[in-house]
Amino acid sequence: MADDLGDEWWENQPAGAASSPGASGGEGGGDTEMTQQETAPGPALSKKVKPPKECFLIQPKETNEDATKTRKRKKKKITDILAKSEPKPGTPEDLQKLMKDYYSSSRSVIELEELTLPDSCFLKANDLTHSLSSYLKEVCPKWVKLRKSHSEKKSVLMLIICGSAIRAVELIRSMTAFKGDSKVMKLFAKHIKVQEQVKLLEKRVVHLGVGTPGRIKELIKQGGLHLNPLKFLIFDWNWRDQKLRRMMDIPEIRKEVFELLEMGVLNLCKTESLKLGLF
């Protein structure tokens, strides 16, 4: 027995005995803990935190094409639409509709019906092929006879209503072939006082008056111009200014025109002693 124990007995143990958990008891768990401690990372070393650097982004320059794409679409103006569309001549129905639209919020249905004018009071409208002289010759073929028989002061036989003093001067120049020996008077406010025009109407016989509705209204109010002898009232309806606006497209002018019509013009039209024309 003693000799057997002296041998290196551990060399004769099976290979799995040393590594088995039962043989080693608590030693195996200690080895595992050692391994975990060795492999576990240690606390991170404190490093100096560098302040963040500012970063500047250089934006690419905007080209003309990009600007065109990002530009907002412009709203179409009435002048742009009218510039591309063909002009349409005014009609008596246009005047009737404008009048009813203007008074629709302030008049009753019965009062609006009273504003309606008979078709017989309208002259043939300009179809955009006439000059002023040719149009007046067509709608007033007996003008020379009327002119010769007119002798009443503070009145005219024909009124031509337009939107501005400059336009009134242009119309007077363009009617030379029609007026002949007729006496023409400018009826607008530019450089001419109302009192001066009243005196001129009192002194001499005038056949034709060309002017703005505002000044004509004022002359009627002050008694300088009587409407009873009036035979023709012509609106410069189709002409457009630099902004492509017609006379009746301008709110101030439209208001004055309708106020003028109510100062006795509508009543004269209904009795058919006065004719309306749209040039």
Swiss-Prot record:
Source superkingdom: Eukaryota
Biased composition (Acidic residues): 1-10
Disulfide bonds: none
One Pfam family this sequence matches: CMS1
InterPro entries reported for this sequence: Cms1, P-loop_NTPase
SUPFAM superfamilies (alphabetical): P-loop containing nucleoside triphosphate hydrolases
Region described as Disordered: 1-94
Protein name in UniProt: Uncharacterized protein C3orf26 homolog
